[in-house]
Amino acid sequence: MSKLKKTKHPFPCFSIWQQFKRKLYRTFALFLVLFLSSVVLFRFVPVPFSAYMLQQKIGYLFEGNLSSTIHYQWVPLEQISQSMQLAVIASEDQRFATHYGFDWDAIQSALQHNQRGKRIRGGSTISQQTAKNLYLWHGQSWLRKAIEMPTTLVLETLWSKKRILEVYLNIAEFGPNIFGVEAASQHYFRKPAKQLSNAEAALLAAVLPNPIIFKVNKPSAYVKKRQQHIQRQMGLLGKQHLSQLD
């Protein structure tokens, strides 16, 4: 009895497309598993580096700048002064304790502010900034924003507010190659982050929107004005505000 010969697919292009889709689904599933696994892992262990740190390092390598060093030192939230914790909430996200990752009022306010042609202001929450810094790339992109939203929701679901704040403070950029509040505190003030005063914490928080242009060691009039505003907001919130974080 003769063996049956395999017949070729009548539509080879369709067959290639099906194979491509299967590979695409598998790749997506692999990335999803790796992402969720890392979120669960980083709920308990210090973050060794962020996607933005990696992006910066790769950029330096492409430029041929092999001597550039990323300054980064992880510290638990208990070793970061309450002044610093309150400063970033007062500066970046005053509804952090109560929202679920997104502050729609702040987003709408930022859009209206930017449409008036004033200094560009963002509406991203601390949760969104943590998602972006930890897993995504910087720059204006609708694709990044589209990925940022579900990433933020996953962090809000699997992490506590305290953990989100802890990771944010440890991976935020405070100057060229200076990541995390401990590295920033040691670099600018020669002291650990747990000893930061209200004024020092407010100054660090003041440069967060653009730490490459805004300088901690040479604050412009605008940065000083932001620092004073943040200190006033810290006084209005009060350190008891931190007790609202779960």
UniProtKB/Swiss-Prot annotation:
It catalyses: [GlcNAc-(1->4)-Mur2Ac(oyl-L-Ala-gamma-D-Glu-L-Lys-D-Ala-D-Ala)](n)-di-trans,octa-cis-undecaprenyl diphosphate + beta-D-GlcNAc-(1->4)-Mur2Ac(oyl-L-Ala-gamma-D-Glu-L-Lys-D-Ala-D-Ala)-di-trans,octa-cis-undecaprenyl diphosphate = [GlcNAc-(1->4)-Mur2Ac(oyl-L-Ala-gamma-D-Glu-L-Lys-D-Ala-D-Ala)](n+1)-di-trans,octa-cis-undecaprenyl diphosphate + di-trans,octa-cis-undecaprenyl diphosphate + H(+). GO terms for molecular function: pentosyltransferase activity; peptidoglycan glycosyltransferase activity. Keywords: Cell inner membrane, Cell membrane, Cell shape, Cell wall biogenesis/degradation, Glycosyltransferase, Membrane, Peptidoglycan synthesis, Transferase, Transmembrane, Transmembrane helix. It is a single-pass membrane protein. Pfam families: Transgly. The chain crosses the membrane at residues 28-48. It is found in: Cell inner membrane. It comes from the Bacteria. GO terms for biological process: cell wall organization; peptidoglycan biosynthetic process; regulation of cell shape. Its main location: membrane. Its EC number is 2.4.99.28. One of its GO terms (cellular component) is peptidoglycan-based cell wall. Pathway: Cell wall biogenesis; peptidoglycan biosynthesis. NCBIfam families: mono_pep_trsgly. Peptidoglycan polymerase that catalyzes glycan chain elongation from lipid-linked precursors. Belongs to the glycosyltransferase 51 family. PANTHER family: BIOSYNTHETIC PEPTIDOGLYCAN TRANSGLYCOSYLASE, MONOFUNCTIONAL BIOSYNTHETIC PEPTIDOGLYCAN TRANSGLYCOSYLASE. HAMAP family: PGT_MtgA. This is Biosynthetic peptidoglycan transglycosylase.
